[in-house]
Swiss-Prot record:
The keyword Transcription applies. It is found in: Nucleus. InterPro entries: Ovate, Ovate_C. Residues 113-183 are annotated as: Disordered. This is Transcription repressor OFP7. One of its GO terms (biological process) is negative regulation of DNA-templated transcription. Residues 160-174 have a biased composition (Polar residues). It comes from Arabidopsis thaliana (Mouse-ear cress). Plants over-expressing OFP7 show kidney-shaped cotyledons, round and curled leaves, small rosette size, late flowering, reduced fertilization and round seeds.
Length: 315
């Protein structure tokens, strides 16, 4: 079987190049070169013996027609000019496998070597997309509504008149209604409070009375200094407190008794108790230096006599 197939392949290759294409020059019953080689040898004087012609296979005839060789080449060419274009006949496909020996096997279907299909995720139609968007919008609106309702419940305030007396004679329709305060009013109230807190402080001459009524001592000190209190490590706190007090008195021109007392209370509130004795000593020296001379010195010094150093002993 393998030898016959090899012979057929050699014949196919030999027919690729034809010597003559003119039908007049071709013999009536052509014989292939391979058949001539296999035919028995005869003498020139003897009669020529004719070899029985073998029937050509359909595969061989198809190869001859494809390569344009043989008897049917020219009439086909003549007919094709006037006839419509015909599609070539389908040839059987073969697949080769090497398993020690070459042999022909049947055609392998695509299903055996078919690659696994991949999952195709369709984007969906426009209707599905619209439905999804509507669902998302509804869920978001519900969340917003729940949050806003919770906030509004916190903002509700019942406005009930104090003069009305609720008796059992009043029906449910006559009861005062619960009203809601809009958020804008709340925001305005917050803004007004912030503007009042950020308003500029009064002048230093009015600080003594204004600070005592409204602000703690720490805030009064910050307003008087118009700056920020600085933390400083000092080896001699007495001299440092004395120098800082003198600078503030000279810069702000604080020569009134109320202003000086406010300055002392601010220093005491901003510092720890262990520094109170040094603060009072420094302030007492400044007080004596300012009000020791003159007729009003005794009266002003008596007002400061209530402050005693024993009250500010170190802890």
């Amino acid at each position: 079987m393998t030898k016959r197939f090899k012979l057929k392949i050699s014949r196919i290759l030999s027919f690729k190049s034809c010597r003559l294409k003119d039908p007049s020059s071709l013999p009536f019953n052509p014989v292939s070169s391979s058949l001539r080689r296999t035919s028995p040898l005869v003498n020139s004087s003897a009669d020529v013996t004719t070899v029985p012609q073998r029937r050509r296979s359909s595969f061989r005839l198809h190869v001859l027609t494809v390569f344009g060789c043989g008897r049917s080449s020219t009439p086909l060419d003549v007919d094709l000019r006037n006839s419509p274009v015909l599609s070539p006949p389908q040839t059987p496909t073969f697949q080769w496998e090497s398993e020690g020996k070459w042999h022909v096997i049947a055609q392998v279907t695509e299903e055996e070597y078919e690659t696994p299909r991949r999952k195709i995720y369709n984007g969906g139609s426009e209707k599905d997309n619209r439905r999804r968007l509507k669902k998302k919008e509804k869920s978001n609106s519900r969340r917003r509504g729940s949050i806003s309702s919770a906030e509004e419940e916190t903002d509700r305030e019942s406005l009930l008149p104090s003069s009305t007396n609720l008796s059992p004679e009043y029906s449910s329709s006559e009861l005062p209604r619960v009203t809601r305060r809009p958020r804008q009013l709340l925001k305005k109230a917050v803004i007004e409070e912030e503007s009042e807190s950020s308003s500029p402080p009064p002048s230093p001459a009015r600080l003594s009375s204004f600070v005592q009524r409204l602000m703690p001592c720490t805030m009064a000190a910050a307003v008087m200094v118009e700056g920020v209190a600085v933390v400083k490590k000092s080896e001699d706190p007495y001299e440092d407190f004395k120098g800082s007090m003198m600078e503030m008195i000279v810069e702000k021109k604080m020569f009134e008794v109320a202003e000086l007392e406010q300055l002392l209370s601010c220093f005491l509130s901003l510092n720890a108790k262990r520094h109170h004795r040094a603060i009072v000593r420094a302030f007492s020296e400044i007080w004596v230096a300012l009000f020791s001379g003159g007729s009003g010195g005794g009266r002003r010094s008596s007002s400061f006599s209530s402050v005693r150093l024993s009250d500010y002993d170190e802890c």
